[in-house]
Amino acid sequence: MSDATAASGPDWAPNDDQQELIDTLDGTVLVDAGPGTGKTFAVTRRYVNLLRSKPIEPGDVCLITFTRNAAAEMRERILDRSEASATTIGDAPIQTFHSLCQDIIKESGFDAPQLLGIDDQITADTRVVSNEIVEETLFEECYEQFRDAHPEHAAILRTVEDPGEIQGLIGELAAKGVFPTAEGWYRGGEAALEGDREAFVERFAALNEPRNGGSKQSRLREMLSSYGDTGLHLPDAPSKASVRGEGKQLPGEMAERVFEADREPLQRFVHDIYIAYLRFALSRNYLTFGFLQLFAFVLLCEDESVRDQVGFEYVMIDEFQDSSEIQFKLALLLARTENICVVGDWKQSIYGFQYADVENILEFDARLDRFAAELNADRPRIEYDTSVDRRIELSRNYRSTASIIEFATAALTTPASGSEEVDAEAVTERLGDLETAIPGVESRIEAIENDDEPAAILTAIGEMVDNDSYAVPDGDGGTRSPTYADIGVLTRTRDFGRSLQAAADEHGLPMAYEGGLEIFRTDQAKLLLAWLRILEADADRGWAVVLERAGYDLGACEAILETASYPDAMVAFRERLRATETLPGVMRTVFDRYGCTGPRAAVLIDTIESIHANTTLTRGGLVGVIARGIEHGTTQEIHAGAGADAVTVRTIHAAKGLEHPIVILANMNSGRFPSSGGSSGNISYEEGAGLRQRDVYAEADGQPYIYRDWKTEIARKCRPTAYDEERRLLYVALSRAQRHILCTAGGRPNTFLEELPVSLEPGVVDIPSFETEAEDRPVFEMPMPEPRGPRSSTPHELGATAEAAAGPAESAGGMSFGDRVHEFAEAYALGDPVAPANDHEEAVASFLDGLSGELRPEEHVHLPLEAEGQQVTLSGIIDLLQITDEAVAIVDYKTDADRTREESYRRQLSAYYHAIAELFPDRNTSVSLFWTGSGEQTEIEPLTRAEVAGFALS
């Protein structure tokens, strides 16, 4: 158990700061909760205290988190301490913004598009597209249709190289609350596109101020030494000399000249493609996360009855530093009273690329008043007092030592480049008084550099493991020598993590890369692309990959390609693929041939099936999608459970909320961290400069050409850098450490590493012998640190031992097939207009048609258990609950081709049995398995509650 999570155990007495939050129930409350301060513990205790102290129900309290895992954890903690029933807490609005918006729309928002003048509706079966690759593919299809249908925008479209930049712009505007209507912009949103003159001029002036007391030219003038070098300006653009001026700074009037721009054609283009994308999504019966929030916001703004219906007496928002502008405004509309509590830490705001706005928490008071005034501009919507009643600081860190806290805090004032000047005084004023709860413990904080950085890291890990000099907490108040699992390697970018994983595999060090993988760059994807190309017109590129994989050298490959005399076995396999009618069939046939199994192949199949199912792309079109995915490095989350004692590797973003006894912060190299960034695309938006277009198509002097817009070139030099967020990212990485930190670089240390208060030493390369075999080290998901006292689990985990003995179930079509059958079963039970697509679904439909009573698909249940002084709460989802006056039947669908795992399913269903028996004590409860392949139903004799508890706690 970690020190940080000890503060969240049920018997842990709250400290004074936590108790203040728990007891402060009314008014607007702003909580500064630094890393390791037990905020989840305090927030969930406050929730329980609300239910005990106020005449309210769980449905009157809205608790917003930013991930489903966080919501589930909070729900479990609340359930462990609340007198409310498991069903009541299970149904309570403890969820993400996106989930809450989806509920609002499903309940009251089918006509929401019409509020924007869109003649379409959201339906009961409108799906939410959460897969980024699927969303990108759908938008590209929309973009192609738009380009063909809107020749009036041809000049702008000629300058767009990547449709993804337009998709990103739409997402950014949606997060800002800028929405189109059929005829214009919602609630004057076009004003935001014009920019903020005062803010732009102020920033321009600050950058244009001469340095060193006037003896050195301004930073802006220095940056514009390359003005005009990267693109040809239109003939009427000013010269470099006139822009930069003769002195140490740009001429004073230049700020106004740069800000003024004719944005009308660009605004019209953005409006038209934005509204076209909304219409396209509705016509395809899907919404994105951004559109969920968009329509929920419009609905709450325009329909007072909906606000009254869904409003809450108490609103609590966790991780508020991760909120966007539209989410802040949604929170105001969801609150009936001033009882709003936001909890967050500006130092950990690292999701700007997902439209999080750190100013929401830094300028909470001002934004609270401003957003309320904006919402009340045309009629009263926010009628409660928006003044902040209480500020609370959680200042006791249960995770890290004093030296680690001090070292991490230094990151917030560390320059990111040699020329950057950090306003350390302003940063220090914002810092709270974070103190350690584990005084007197020494930490090792070290830094090394070596040209062979991966080898140096492996050497360092070998030195740390089983070394008492790197002692870590043992969970009982003492210390022990570290294991591999105590070490977490964090990187700014994924590519280094993959390189390190490869080095670890080569030397036998147990290591697992966790998180986003560039799925289309895997061997599985490249093989699939090769065979799809062979089936299409681009055969040579496909054959080259396949032949190389088969072991043919370059000369042999060239000879085969030149004569088209392909090996007979490969030709036969090609014909077999041609005879395969479906794309999923082609994929599985390819993967079966090459023995591609495991999570990577499964995620790849699921991703491509989703693209195929949700778009009109042909097989040839999918070849293009995979090829672009390889080029762009599109990522997808992959998790494969593993219980190995292994070092974990993650990006810093993926490590948010986690902790490790030892943190190795790797790849601290120039150009890698801080991120060197890159072009923001041709069309971009920034609050100060407004909507801008860098490259413009024009015919100057009768010659068509794409010119560089001189005003945008200068305006982009005035944009705020992302260095503040990079510093916060550095802070997050360092504050994951409990006891020790090692920073590493590969010969080009970045400014961060050079400026941090740590001695940079030469790294040693002397890799020891490791015992673990590479094949025993799959990618896996590191669990959250386990809290003291009651823990949570799922009924599925009860069958782990039996499943391991029986081996993996042989499904009729794999996990994605099973998911589709379950989705059909849920929709059919709800009465949705769906038709069976295969024999399994036919069997499900026939089974459901024969049932009487109330049918509840996908029913969430919770079962608290206790045995030998230990506690655990099982949570799960029942496929189908059939309720009649006399009985309650639990049904679990199984697509397995055989019944070898029936015993493991018995354990799972037994947990469901006891949970439901508690809810319906006056009715007979039964459990059964429905085998979709045969249409047979098997009654299950449930285990006793004590037996279930024994398995759960074993």
Give, region by region, the residue ranges found by the protein language model:
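Conserved motor-region signature of P-loop NTPase helicases/translocases
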Residues: S2-E76, M316-I317, Q321-V342, W346-D538, ...
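Conserved P-loop NTPase-based nucleic-acid remodeling module centered on helicase motor cores
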Residues: P58-N208, E359-E363
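Conserved helicase C-terminal RecA-like lobe
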Residues: T483, Q501-A502, L529-R736, H740, ...
